[in-house]
Amino acid sequence: MSVEDLKATVTKLQDRISYLEQKAGVVPNVPKSVRMVLIGPPGAGKGTQAPNLKEKYCACHLATGDMLRAQVAAKSALGVEAKKIMDQGGLVSDEIMVNMIKSELENNKECSNGFILDGFPRTIPQAEKLDSMLETRKTPLENAVELKIDDELLVARITGRLVHPASGRSYHKLFNPPKKDMIDDVSGDALVQRSDDNEDALKKRLVTYHKQTEPIVDYYRKTGIWSGVDASQKPGKVWDDILKCLGQK
């Protein structure tokens, strides 16, 4: 018997054992883990797709803006330090942001089967610091998925965007409306329209995004974990394409 034959036999045995254990209720049917960065401009659909990824992979969704606000509200050591900097008009350092992510990975039970990072990294130094921290933990990134879409379409999309602040779920007045006007489908909470979701503010954010993000995309291309998805498609098709990128289709 060749080495390849042995490997095939072992794989079949492992699959059979897993099946029998699950059937007997010995272990839960835990999905494949995920360790990824979701990249995309404001309005590309990260707020639509990230909750889907979280649910499918039983992983945590780390939207760094929300995470920062939560740490400040909780008055954690990192949150207090970050608030002091923000109150002085400064930018929170890369070290603080990476340590916040590290704290979530170590203390948030939802992160035990992986994580979806959203909104970080935005610069090459941030990407390098993140990689260093994750490699030290032996949980390196496996995928960097970019949601690609033309700026003109984004303007049409984002000016009708509605958000559920607590979960990050997002809707659109025309393209993806909630079942009840201005009400979140899942929780029944009121939806809000962000103050910076207007055309002028968006165009400024897009200039910053392109300037920051193009080098990040190149960085992940070079590491071999980047893949791109056409985010101008309907959400269901975008979801299918993301799963293909993650080897699930």
Swiss-Prot record:
AMP binds at T64, R69, G90, L91, V92, G119, F120, P121, R122, Q126, R194, R205. Residues 63-92 are annotated as: NMP. Keywords: ATP-binding, Cytoplasm, Kinase, Mitochondrion, Nucleotide-binding, Transferase. The keyword tRNA processing does not apply. It is found in: Cytoplasm, Cytosol; Mitochondrion intermembrane space. PROSITE patterns: ADENYLATE_KINASE. InterPro entries: Adenyl_kin_sub, Adenylat/UMP-CMP_kin, Adenylat_kinase_CS, Adenylate_kinase_lid-dom, AK2, P-loop_NTPase. GO terms for biological process: ADP biosynthetic process; AMP metabolic process; ATP metabolic process; DNA replication initiation; pre-replicative complex assembly. Its EC number is 2.7.4.3. One of its GO terms (molecular function) is ATP binding. Residues 160-197 are annotated as: LID. It catalyses: AMP + ATP = 2 ADP. GO terms for cellular component: cytosol; mitochondrial intermembrane space. The keyword Kinase applies. ATP binds at G43, A44, G45, K46, G47, T48, R161, S170, Y171, Q233. Consists of three domains, a large central CORE domain and two small peripheral domains, NMPbind and LID, which undergo movements during catalysis. The LID domain closes over the site of phosphoryl transfer upon ATP binding. Assembling and dissambling the active center during each catalytic cycle provides an effective means to prevent ATP hydrolysis. Catalyzes the reversible transfer of the terminal phosphate group between ATP and AMP. Plays an important role in cellular energy homeostasis and in adenine nucleotide metabolism. Adenylate kinase activity is critical for regulation of the phosphate utilization and the AMP de novo biosynthesis pathways. Monomer. Belongs to the adenylate kinase family. AK2 subfamily. This is Adenylate kinase.
